[in-house]
């Protein structure tokens, strides 16, 4: 973050994605504490991959906050992957953390976590959750992404690819009544805020 990658001049702009599991263990908690210390020292935001249980979200946040991290510098990712209730996501929002919905385009995907099959929500369900959060007053904390991380996420292999949000999701949001301001905040202003070092 401060030195860069060898002599390239390229520096990391974010701490993470910090992977976590549930139940958490002392090694994971130590990594979270180190991430918090690095964020305080550098001003970089922290991106969290939470464990797949509702209790994991607040546990990870509490570990970071207790170690000194500013909740406004924490991005809680994959809020649209695991079956978190609206109430749990609202609890995260109330801390001031950024809410990341990052698996747009993965509607027909499922995987196993902790011995349970998890079916991802549809893009419509993701949009509905974001709409609900905006109604609750959390628009300034929402970011979206596609987390293109599997071959099947690529257009050449049947996925939505890197353009899915702009080509498919934004038009759907507009049809549902999202304003230009809503969309600009989610796509531009909120990422700009969280990615700017403090």
Q: Model features per residue range: what roles?
A:
Residues 1-41, 95-98, 105, 115-116:
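Active-site gating/metal-coordination segments in enzymes
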Residues 12-14, 45-47, 73-75, 96-100, ...:
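Structural preference for beta-strand elements that scaffold enzyme active sites
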Residues 20, 51-53, 77-82, 104-106, ...:
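Active-site beta-loop-alpha junctions enriched in small/polar residues
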Residues 26-29, 53-68, 85-93:
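Distinct, well-ordered alpha-helical segments
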Residues 47, 101-103, 138-159, 183:
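Short acidic/histidine-rich active-site segments
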Residues 66-72, 136-138, 175-179:
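Short helix-capping segments at alpha-helix termini
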Residues 74-86, 107-131:
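Active-site glycine- and acidic-residue-rich loops that bind
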Residues 164-198:
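Mid-to-C-terminal alpha-helical segments outside catalytic/metal-binding sites
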